[in-house]
Amino acid sequence: MLRIPRDEPVLFASDTHLAPEAPETAERFLAALEREGPTAPHLFLLGDLFELWVGDDCADPLAARLAAILSGLAARGVAVRLMRGNRDFLLDVPRPGAWDVPYSARCGATLLDDPCPLELHGVPALLAHGDALCTDDLVYQQWRATCREPAWQATFLARPLAERFAIGRGARETSEAGKREKPGALMDVNAAAVDAAMDAADATLLVHGHTHRPATHRWRAGGAERTRVVLTDWDAPAGRGALLRWEDGRAVA
């Protein structure tokens, strides 16, 4: 298990949704990485870095810029760790018969499992993207299970890149339209699912993104206090988006 000592600060981010259609948000995030990335020895990016990711053969200028920044941080000694989200669940998934360089390798980063247990400043913790905890949304959970099956991924990644982009854009539009029809509570985490995940990991701290509802929640379960930290999404025109700094056992920014 990964253990991060109390004297080593950590930076967290998720849900940056990098896309050519959102240049201000991309600049906000990349500038934050360049400015703050060197100030902490650990950087965790917990999914949905990209609004759309259809394979590691994407020749995306934003992806190239991000990889250059992250590999630069890694060269300076920062431990960079990535996690897949619901938008970029195909990160590092190999295409049949291809020899693409995994995106995490281009970034000098380590790809994490979701969820990922660790000891953070002496506290048993769990990191997750967060979508697996939204168990009330049965339609999404069925899709999530399907698109993570190796056979489905191999079939999809065998398609030409242009076709994959077209399918991905269509799926994104359908998803956004569906969100407008769903009750807000349906797209939030389920409390029982949160407790079950934390029980399984023996964790008292959970850090996740996905819901775009930044907050810190505290409650008691099994006689112990638990904390759930929800990371912000990034949307520069709306004024949202900042790296969360964890220092001396608590969030300080």
Task: Describe the function of each predicted region.
Residues V101-D113, P124-L126, D131, T135-W143, ...:
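Conserved beta-sheet core of the metallophosphoesterase superfamily
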Residues D57-R76, E181-L186, A193-L206:
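N-terminal short leaders/motifs
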Residues A63-I69, L91-Y103, Y140-W143, A171-V189, ...:
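A broadly tuned preference for mixed-charge, low-complexity surface segments
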Residues A128-N190:
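Active-site-proximal loop/helix segment associated with metal-binding centers of metalloenzymes
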Residues A32-E36, R65-A68, Y103-A105, C147-A151, ...:
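Short, surface-exposed linear patches
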Residues L2-P9, A13, L18-L120:
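Core catalytic region of metal-dependent phosphoesterases/phosphodiesterases
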Residues E8-V10, D15, E21, E27, ...:
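Hydrophobic/basic alpha-helical segments enriched in Actinobacteria
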